Each structure stands twice: as structure tokens, then as C-alpha cells.
Amino acid sequence: MKILYIILFIQIGWIFPLSAQKQDSIYIGTRHTLFSEILNEERKYWIYVPETKAGEKGKAYPVLYLLDGDSFFHSVVGFTRFFSSSKTSNLPPCIVVAVLNTDRTRDFTPTCSAARRDGTICPYDKPAGGGAEQFHRFLIEELRLEVENKVPANGTNFLVGHSYAGLFTLQTLSN
């Protein structure tokens, strides 16, 4: 019986080295950090650059700036990769820049308010928000310049957001 346990123990010992074989990584982007003088804080962002195909050396791409990037980077990169490779789609390959959040209410809302979602205001609630103009300046004056120095951008830019980020995107479009 003792021999059976020893044989079983040795066989289990072989399983772990087999599962520890080198695995291929899935790589979709790089992480970056930028200190914003406008916002007076460190901002993180991630960049995905499409794979360059043979004969496309030096090709530049449009840039899609993705707000709430920490939540949607993987899905948007997958979406752009799939639809830019489809023969039925007109979406060109594009660079995706995911802008990570630090304070959504401050950055994405145009006015400061103490009102709650239902419209009520309590005396102890502090006003929040109203930093959309500064965040817009950060995107244009700091982040875009930083990104264009790192990637082969062609000058065409898109801004994508939903919820508060969608509010910010629509405000940016209307101005």
C-alpha cells in the first residue's frame, strides 16, 4: 500500500511541471502615465496599435480616444480588430487610447451641482462636478500631443464615451 502512495505521489508531481510549460501571451496594448499640469494629477492611459501588415511600413492610423477606458478597453480593441479586418466593414484599423478614470463626475460634467439623481438637494451634500472644460483641455493640449509623439497617428481623432462620458462626448461635439 505504501508503494501505491509513493507511485501516486510521483505521478502527481509530474502533472505540475507539465502545466507550467511556457504559455504564449496575448498582447493588446501598453500602459502609460502622464502628469497633467492642467488637472494637477497623474493620469493613466493604455494604447493599442494595430499590427502592421507586410508592405505597410510607416502607415499612420486614426486614433480612437476611449473614455472609461479601464472598463471598455478590451472589448473596444476586439471590436475594432474584428470590424477592421472584415471585408464587409468600412471601419479602418485604428489606434485605441483608453483614458482611465480618476474622478468621473468632476471630469465629465460641465456644471457643478449638489443635486442627487432624483433632483433633491440635502443640506450636507457637497457640490460636485463641473470640470469638463479642464478635462477637455487635458485631452487636447496634453494627452493628444503625448499620444501623437508615441504612435503613428494620421490626424483623424474619435472620442467615445457613455453615461457621463457620453455627456462629455456630446458636449465636446456641440462645442
Residue locations for each model-derived region?
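Gly/Ala-rich beta-loop-alpha elbow adjacent to hydrolase catalytic centers
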Residues: 160-165, 169
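Conserved hydrolase catalytic core segment
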Residues: 171-175
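Bacterial Sec-dependent N-terminal signal peptides
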Residues: 1-24
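Loop/turn elements at helix/coil->beta-strand transitions in domains of secreted/extracellular proteins
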Residues: 60-62, 91-95, 154-156
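Active-site glycine-rich loops that stabilize anionic/oxyanionic intermediates
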Residues: 61, 67-72
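Conserved acidic catalytic loop of the alpha/beta-hydrolase fold
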Residues: 137-155
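A domain-start/cap signature at the N-terminus of enzymes
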Residues: 18-62
